[in-house]
Amino acid sequence: MDKKQARLKRAAKTRHVIRAMGANRLTVHRTPRHIYAQVISPDGGTVLAAASTLESAIRETLPVTGNKDAAIAVGRRIAEKALAVGISSVAFDRSGFKYHGRVKALAEAAREAGLQF
């Protein structure tokens, strides 16, 4: 089992537990250049809110999109969008990534902006 397969296996376990809870899920995906966040409905079929460093509103304000500052901006943006749709409580799905660095920065920024998890 290589590194990616191990991460995907961890992610599948987490998603199974979150689906059993029946909560909206804040999922995060990171690449070396960008970071993405989505709030997904409990059935797993509908994206209720999404934010990433590919959005022009975020991309124009940052010189680099693959660092903690970018993750903080995406965390604030996803919280704003989720609250605008009426979602205040979510379950955090780190997609098998370690809760460290950019993933942690995004989560903390979303909490500070009003999301509860």
From Swiss-Prot:
Functional note: This is one of the proteins that bind and probably mediate the attachment of the 5S RNA into the large ribosomal subunit, where it forms part of the central protuberance.
Coiled coil: none
An annotated GO BP: translation
PANTHER family listed in its UniProt record: 39S RIBOSOMAL PROTEIN L18, MITOCHONDRIAL, LARGE RIBOSOMAL SUBUNIT PROTEIN UL18M
Lineage start: Bacteria, Pseudomonadati, Pseudomonadota, Gammaproteobacteria, Methylococcales
Family: Belongs to the universal ribosomal protein uL18 family.
Keywords: Ribonucleoprotein, Ribosomal protein, RNA-binding, rRNA-binding
Molecular function terms from GO: 5S rRNA binding; structural constituent of ribosome
The keyword Cell cycle is assigned to this record: no
Domain of life where this protein originates: Bacteria
SUPFAM superfamilies: Translational machinery components
Record's subunit section: Part of the 50S ribosomal subunit; part of the 5S rRNA/L5/L18/L25 subcomplex. Contacts the 5S and 23S rRNAs.
GO CC annotation: cytosolic large ribosomal subunit
Annotated protein name in UniProt: Large ribosomal subunit protein uL18
Cited Pfam families: Ribosomal_L18p (PF00861)
